[in-house]
């Protein structure tokens, strides 16, 4: 088989040219990073779990009419997705105060926010993905006003879907991050959800105990990250309840 051409490698995924024009193969790695990659580890099985979970969420969104780049899962670590022109903005939706909003605004972690709050972050690792306003986005032409309106609408629909799905299995969706890309169909452009949706990009807390089931387990050294992700996958029915536990993380020197 011919060697595939690598398009891009990020912290958690590798993108390869797809088998058909306009497609990409997205490969999920076992690497975990935090604090702008200052903290690193290899977590056996993490890529498999995120591939399956992102497939689950993207398929669900497609099913309710929220367009995503997901086409199909190819194997345990890879999925076929549509090629998109990524807008260089991360969209964060917050339902409960945690992480940077608690630090910035002095809101105690766990405080329910009066409504979902949408934030924008400029995608630039060298700058630490700084928070930006709509004015910045339009002034620097990262996206148009219409794009922004569509991005917010997409993000809030994702929030409604994800909140309901998680609530049904006893998990609170604290916040999440998505990326959005442009696809061109004839003379028309539309925006679709891209990248991934997984515990890497969400904060997930057990409703009863407050136990963290997301990447904060790794950030804060709260336990075994693969066990937390496996718990989410099992509750959602993505993995059977008797799935083999993942091995413990191995730190990279």
Curated annotation (Swiss-Prot):
One of its GO terms (biological process) is cobalamin biosynthetic process. It catalyses: 5-amino-1-(5-phospho-D-ribosyl)imidazole-4-carboxylate + L-aspartate + ATP = (2S)-2-[5-amino-1-(5-phospho-beta-D-ribosyl)imidazole-4-carboxamido]succinate + ADP + phosphate + 2 H(+). It is an enzyme of class 6 (ligase). It holds the Pfam family SAICAR_synt. One of its GO terms (molecular function) is ATP binding. The keyword Transmembrane does not apply. Keywords: ATP-binding, Ligase, Nucleotide-binding, Purine biosynthesis. GO terms for cellular component: cytosol. CDD domains: SAICAR_synt_PurC. Its EC number is 6.3.2.6. Pathway: Purine metabolism; IMP biosynthesis via de novo pathway; 5-amino-1-(5-phospho-D-ribosyl)imidazole-4-carboxamide from 5-amino-1-(5-phospho-D-ribosyl)imidazole-4-carboxylate: step 1/2. Belongs to the SAICAR synthetase family. PANTHER family: MULTIFUNCTIONAL PROTEIN ADE2, SI:DKEY-6E2.2. This is Phosphoribosylaminoimidazole-succinocarboxamide synthase. The gene is purC.
